[in-house]
Amino acid sequence: MNIIVNGEPRQATAPITVAQLLSELKLPQRGVAVEVNLQIVPRAQHAEYQLQDGDRLEVVSLVGGG
C-alpha cells in the first residue's frame, strides 16, 4: 500500500498500524505526535489504528529544551 509520511511517498505492507510504522521507521513509541489525514491519533490508539492506502501522515518528534 502507498502512504505519505512527512511529505515523502512510502510503501508499507498492509495491514499496518501506527505503532508498527513507528517501529519500522525506528522511532520511539513515546515522544512523538502522529497525525493521519489532518487528525491527531492519540498515543493510546497507535497499536490499534490501522493505516489505509493513500493515508497522509505527519510524524513529529518532541524535543525538550530551554
Regions found by a protein language model. Name each.
Residues 1-7:
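Eukaryote-biased recognition of intrinsically disordered, low-complexity regulatory segments
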Residues 16-26:
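Short amphipathic, charge-patterned alpha-helical segments
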Residues 41-46:
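Short alpha-helix capping/helix-loop boundary micro-motifs
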Residues 65-66:
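Glycine-centered recognition micro-motifs in short, flexible terminal segments and loops
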